[in-house]
Amino acid sequence: ENLSFNPLNEPCGFTTEQYARVFGETLIAIREADPVRFVMLDGNHVASEPVPLFFNFKSTGQAFRGYTPHAVSHYRADYIHDQPKGEPSWPCGPGPEDDPNCWIWEQPETTLKKYAWVIGTGYPVMIGEFGCRNKLRHETCLKWMEHCLKLWRDNGLSWAIWNMDGPCGFLDSDRADVDYEDFHGHKLDRKMLNLLQKYMQP
């Protein structure tokens, strides 16, 4: 009875009208089967823009992403072709302000500002995904993660990490610069786990 779900991950290329039609029809069908089931909707444009139309729908919320800036969270990801010239650091990045490859001016706060007014309405909002790929230096990754986690905690936001095990997680992440701890046959990144636990909300 506590199970919720997200009907569509990171809708992209939708006009507001298309988003409203697709999710509106989906919610109607869900409500016919279960009038009170909570449904989390990703914001439009890869979960970066809130859609106010659904604020009046009972038992719904909206999720956005916690990957800003992508040059940090997705550093050297094999599916990202536009990479920064140098390896990112945190909180400073390579390049001057007018350098298009410089990501320092894109902060996690930038994404949060788009949803700040929604949070103020009391409508449920959360960070549906966040994490940092395993090619970034571990120290930099943890600094960036703590920046994000503190920001969200201070704004009363819940969050979900992209994966617990794998390239963004704290188990079997295959990072070259982590002193892993054996945990029931898995390689545990204790520093990352401790950081996440530090900011977990009851």
Functional labels for PLM-detected ranges:
Residues 1-102, 112-133, 154-155:
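Active-site region of glycoside hydrolase catalytic domains
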Residues 137-202:
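Aromatic-rich peripheral "rim/lid" segments of glycoside hydrolase catalytic domains that contact
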